[in-house]
């Protein structure tokens, strides 16, 4: 379990962002011309407190959000959140901070492209394969797809990270969408430049040409049945550093619990997903590829 200092750190960063976010939006939002009166009543918990509670859940050892909220937030951390509402009310308030949390990820939490980017996809199952026909929450939304670990009913998460282990961008698609789909990279590669290192599942001449037009060089390994070709020594070494993106996927699933089958609505599934990505940005044990940009500093030459 993390220390109470982490709660204070998270809240201060998020609250400062929410103040700037609200100041920018004041008077700039579109008016509601539907004629329906809205009270615009403030909740007992502020938006920054709701976001802090959502993110802090993924730092601890709790496997169940309900127990975390009832016994930890309303119990141990009662002095930090004296106006905590009931659990049912908090679940209703989660979706209120969706836009604030998305803006916070893109403007205040995610890293920036350094010219060295790693990309990978991971399956996000929503239920067991045998229960996919009985699942009603994601009926018509989740799809069946096959990955390296077998068949999956759910979604596929594409992640792009830099050499410091910081997430740059993400895309959530159906599980049956190919990794080589250019529509995925129309969103994923908006902020990228330089070299993009990927596994063999991204080998596609169409995708390579699409990225090259935007100034991005796709670097992948070679399949067994492909002709051998010369590759710069630096690119070969950086392909070995793809463990960074694999480590991120492992931390998201095993530490931050991005995958579980207890979702009762699509909106809560989305809130859990972006909360996990936001919490990872504040993890202290991120993997790094390079201490500098010199290959000798990584001591990879000793492998030969």
Placement of each model-derived feature along the sequence:
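Short alpha-helical elements
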Residues: 1-304
